Amino acid sequence: MDTMLKSNPQTQQRSNHNGQETSLWSSSFGMKMEAITPFLGKYRPFMGRCCQTCTPKSWESLFHRSIMDLGFCNVILVKEENTRFRGWLVRRLCYFLWSLEQHIPTSFDASQKIMENTGVQNLLSGRVPGAAGEGQAPELVKKEVQRILGHIQTTPRPFLLRLFSWALLWFLNRLFLNVQLHKGQMKMVQKAVQEGSPLVFLSTHKSLLDGFLLPFVLFSQGLGVVRVALDSRTCSPALRALLRKLGGLFLPPEVNLSLDNSEGILARAVVRATVEELLTSGQPLLIFLEEPPGSPGPRLSALGQAWLGVVIQAVQAGIISDATLVPVAIAYDLVPDAPCNMNHDLAPLGLWTGALAVFRRLCNCWGCNRRVCVRVHLAQPFSLQEYTINARSCWDSRQTLEHLLQPIVLGECSVVPDTEKEQEWTPPTGLLLALKEEDQLLVRRLSRHVLSASVASSAVMSTAIMATLLLLKHQKGVVLSQLLGEFSWLTEETLLRGFDVGFSGQLRCLAQHTLSLLRAHVVLLRVHQGDLVVVPRPGPGLTHLARLSMELLPTFLSEAVGACAVRGLLAGRVPPEGPWELQGIELLSQNELYRQILLLLHLLPQDLLLPQPCQSSYCYCQEVLDRLIQCGLLVAEETPGSRPACDTGRQHLSAKLLWKPSGDFTDSESDDFEEPGGRCFRLSQQSRCPDFFLFLCRLLSPILKAFAQAATFLHLGQLPDSEVAYSEKLFQFLQACAQEEGIFECADPNLAISAVWTFKDLGVLQEMPSPTGPQLHLSPTFATRDNQDKLEQFIRQFICS
């Protein structure tokens, strides 16, 4: 499946003439999804180039255009040709023989090297003030170090690794249709290995299966045993013991003790020594930058930032000269272990519970063609040392959301400050707090930078495109022939924006595959003309489709922000229900557009936008405006008396440079620019624009409507209360509104939590101590009904009903 889907006009009409086909569900598709001509002649974009601003040398050194044409491979497809043997018996035992032939480096003296680490030796000798070794017998401290080390890791067992690889390969072939990996991306990683720096893979986290699948993919490509930093909260003690023998790493609970606690100092020193030994020996390390799936809370993982901070500390201390960071993204048609109830934390997975879950999955997959496809993406590696040097020069001053947005919401000010927003929802761990404040900031911005790159380079799967169409355009149903045409259109729009898709095949077969995966959330009805009608199931099914459609949001995020900003600009001029021609009459100045875009950028959470720290808001506003012009929604309008935009002959040369650094706002109104805010735009009157504009606005509707309903919820007077209890009450309110209004895509606990945290940053809610713990209170500023209405009105201006 290494090319695009093929759009054949005859397939869109075949549903009217194929009387023998009784149901889409009963028709098989799996064996027909073959590599064919690229979709509409478009090439497949090569995703994942590293940041040219922060890492220009890495951007040039580890990439060559020839690797773009290497194509894809199915990692779990192991045949007789993948072994050194031939014959009918080999064809039946190829999985087992393949696992025996994999090279597994062994190191039995790792524990001894960790004990000989300088930091550990200082603890054993009592030379660290306040540590556990001060005033204690060295033997007692040594036993404590060995106990902590046993909690972190054990030496991987080669026999167990081979046995597990064979079992996992067998299981993955029954669970997935394929696991695709670009050969060119793998070649970049292999080239980075030859440079000698240890590899650190920084990945998104979509499923609990990621911790097994990604190490297997890297192991199968000859990168050796990848050590995986796992979350001890998701595993029982028995499962943790097994995973350590397979290369897993776990943080001891003592690392989160206070900075002056002796046990905490000892645990953090052992963790640093362990990571230093892994990096020095050249073992690859895999860190997940997102929180485990299903856990409510911030998107960026506190655990991932802690491990990344230890890696940065090792490089800065000179333990290793450099480390090579590789952003990783993984995409599923459907996440295999997606929890049905997202409102509660997942219980730790036990050894027998996991085995039972695997057995149930195998039973469900037996004789079933509804297997999902997986796409693993390895972005361009880059140097940590180079990023550290260049990134510090991009840092600028930032302000809280309360200072940036609250005066504008209340109507006390109309000017948006020219500073960036400071918003950090991920709580710091003990390992991160032990670093200097400057290094803590480096870890946070690097993790956000890498996660942004990983999400942007992730392939868009067919289920995300189908769910987006059904949710945003056809909640009341659509005939299959029309749905096929719009699926083809949205796929092309995705490719034109430089994003890749994780599927290929005949269009009709692909639709059968996608709808069969979504059969729990859609209904198929046959009409008398012979066509089929696809209808989304109301209720929780729409919430599930909304979660799937969020995978498509990064592709259209800039245009969606711009469309909602235009909607907010027109809200006070034209009635929302007014005709498109009436809205197209209004002139929109560039300064007004910039202001509205900035307001929306400040309102939306950074966990959703994932802006790159090296990019200023000014540059993002310009990018949004450019995207709106490129997609045809905005057209330039020449005001009377102004010089035409195409007339470059009469431009006067200035003695000063006509450019400025991306973070410099001091010269935004300079006279050196003839008409900085004089450019005006109008909405395009093309026939396709109204539908596309509405489509873009609806991409951000779930979170904006959740915020607006959270503002309405303030009227009910549910405060003071704890943050957890208040978030739960808000989620129940969103569910009640969903039942009344049919807006089920807003009934998501994560949206409720985002609304509460945004309102805290905005100064609407305040957290105060109490005997029972911290309590949320309504701030005095928003205690009046008038200011609450202003907040709700400010949010609703961006919503297109």
Swiss-Prot record:
SUPFAM superfamilies for the chain: Glycerol-3-phosphate (1)-acyltransferase
Protein origin, superkingdom: Eukaryota
Modified residues (Phosphothreonine): T666
Protein location: Mitochondrion outer membrane
Record topological domains on the Mitochondrial intermembrane side: 333-449
Tissue expression as described in the entry: Highly expressed in the testis. Expressed at lower levels in the heart, liver, kidney, spleen and adipose cells. Only detected in primary spermatocytes.
Chain positions covered by the region annotation Acyltransferase: 180-290
Cytoplasmic side: 1-305, 473-801
Keyword Nucleotide-binding: no
Entry EC no(s): 2.3.1.15, 2.3.1.51
Molecular function terms, GO-annotated: 1-acylglycerol-3-phosphate O-acyltransferase activity; glycerol-3-phosphate O-acyltransferase activity
Activity regulation behaviour: Inhibited by N-ethylmaleimide (NEM).
Catalyzed chemical reaction(s): sn-glycerol 3-phosphate + an acyl-CoA = a 1-acyl-sn-glycero-3-phosphate + CoA; a 1-acyl-sn-glycero-3-phosphate + an acyl-CoA = a 1,2-diacyl-sn-glycero-3-phosphate + CoA; 1-(9Z-octadecenoyl)-sn-glycero-3-phosphate + (9Z)-octadecenoyl-CoA = 1,2-di-(9Z-octadecenoyl)-sn-glycero-3-phosphate + CoA; 1-(9Z-octadecenoyl)-sn-glycero-3-phosphate + (5Z,8Z,11Z,14Z)-eicosatetraenoyl-CoA = 1-(9Z)-octadecenoyl-2-(5Z,8Z,11Z,14Z)-eicosatetraenoyl-sn-glycero-3-phosphate + CoA
Record-stated family: Belongs to the GPAT/DAPAT family.
Function: Transfers an acyl-group from acyl-ACP to the sn-1 position of glycerol-3-phosphate producing a lysophosphatidic acid (LPA), an essential step for the triacylglycerol (TAG) and glycerophospholipids. In vitro also transfers an acyl-group from acyl-ACP to the LPA producing a phosphatidic acid (PA). Prefers arachidonoyl-CoA as the acyl donor. Required for primary processing step during piRNA biosynthesis. Molecular mechanisms by which it promotes piRNA biosynthesis are unclear and do not involve its acyltransferase activity.
Domain observations: The HXXXXD motif is essential for acyltransferase activity and may constitute the binding site for the phosphate moiety of the glycerol-3-phosphate.
Protein's name according to its UniProt entry: Glycerol-3-phosphate acyltransferase 2, mitochondrial
Protein encoded by which gene: Gpat2
